[in-house]
Amino acid sequence: MTDPLQQVLRLNAIDRVALAVLLERFGLQLTLTAPEEVIPGSYWGDSEAGLKGQRLYARLDTPVHSVLHEASHFVCMSPERRAGLDRDAGGSDLEEAAVCYLQVLLAEQLPQVGRERLFADMDAWGYSFRCGSTRGWFEQDAQDARQWLRQHGVLDAEGVVSGALAGADG
């Protein structure tokens, strides 16, 4: 039987230029580390993405959902937390929900990823939601996350990613 964790989409299987361009919209630089090298700023270790300052670190074996999750933390955190960022993104439970919601929206902007693939990968990795699945949560129970993203300027009134960082002026 195949291990579902081994089946998640990894960075080596997507257009990394498209990913870097997406991250640059938010002032975040994708920095690849060598295979088997410890990923700087990684909270969870192993192949999980890391944040340090305005850099998002990853290896080619890093899961795409991990990169998008950490990028979403960067977008959602306050300017003060962003300024001192090194490994621990912090934030409230509601902000964490907003991060999960945003990572799905960002996945839709990457040609080889998309919402459906991210739902499957988040479920396989063990993300846990009240509705039992990422899709169920996103479609039925994420009103608070959407509202948080709108209130902080990350989504516009139509629910589209604005390109702004939370707490950014203007």
Regions found by a protein language model. Give the residues of each.
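Short, amphipathic alpha-helical segments
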Residues: 13, 93-100, 112, 116
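Secondary-structure capping and boundary motifs in well-ordered enzyme cores
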Residues: 56-64, 91, 95
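Active-site recognition of the HExxH zinc-binding catalytic motif
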Residues: 65-78
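Amphipathic repeat-derived elements
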Residues: 18-43, 90, 148-170
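Long, well-structured alpha-helical subdomains associated
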Residues: 110-170
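Auxiliary, metal-adjacent structural segments of Zn-dependent hydrolase domains
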Residues: 1-50, 57-61, 105, 109-110
